[in-house]
Every structure is written in structure tokens, then in C-alpha cells.
Amino acid sequence: MKNLFFLAVVVFFALLSCRNDDRSVQQIDQVLNIYIDSAGQDMLNTKIKGSYTTVRWNDINGLTDNSPVSFNTAKDADTLNYMEYLAGAKRIAVDSSGSSKTYESRINLFLTKKINDSTNSVGKDLMVIHYTSTPDLFEVSKIWYNNILKFAKVQGQPNIVKITK
């Protein structure tokens, strides 16, 4: 009797593992490359006078007032500096219709610039990121920087945001 029960369990799991899964895998497109320049000057190059010496990101929707958001700085083929953001800020659902959902992340950017040997200036900017999620695709859809639309997704194109100060 024990053998029959064991055999039934093995057959059940064998049949369960052979089932056909018709669900497709959701594609994710959320990597952002953010460039900041002023009058043609790469503001993220710390070696250029007048550029930002430090940049910090803080998640407005984070659990605490101080919720840092991680990002990487990198250089492109033209040796321009940019900030690469993968994920990390909390996403809040703002709209849902059928199988499509819209999420929003709100991030403060603190941009420190050296004025002279003893004085730094810290600017505070706001970036709002909208994501669209469907069963097949999760992607960045729009980005506002200081309440100005700076990016709208074009299918097949990289998520590059260019900020001019």
C-alpha cells in the first residue's frame, strides 16, 4: 500500500512537471543613461572646473527621509560622463487599466558644485520616472526633470536622457 501511494505521488509530480506553460517571459527595459551638460560642458566630469563634484540621489517615496538611490557613473564612446540607473527607487502605482499598469518613482538629485576653495553650492533637482507594465513588457515610459518632460520612450531605442542646465 505504501508503494502504491509513493508511486502515485511520483506519477503526479512527473505529470505536473511535463505540463506546457504558455505564458511568455516579461521583457524588462528599465536601464537609464542620464547626461547633464551646460553650454556644451560635461557637468558630470569632476575634472572640469565648474562641473559637479558630487551627485547624490534620494528616493522621495522611500521608507525614511534619507533613502539613497544607487546609480553608477560611466563614460560613453565619446568619453562623456553619464549616470546609469538600473533600479532602486520605490515605485508607486498611479494608474491601472486592464492588463496595463503605470508606476512612478520620484527622486531628488543633489548636485554639489565647488564655487571656490571654501564654498560649495548644492542644487536640488527633481526627477520623476514613469514605468509601464504589461504582461509582456516592463519599461521606462516617460521622465520629467524639474517638471519638464525630458524623455518619452521610443520602442527599440535606448533610454537616454539629456539634461541641459
List each model region and its residues.
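Bacterial signal peptide processing site
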Residues: 19-22
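A short, Gly/Thr-enriched small/hydrophobic beta-strand-prone motif that recurs across taxa
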Residues: 24-38
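Short coil-to-beta strand junction motifs in C2/discoidin
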Residues: 28, 46-55
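Tryptophan-paired
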Residues: 52-116
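Glycine-rich, aromatic-bearing surface loops/beta-hairpins
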Residues: 117-165
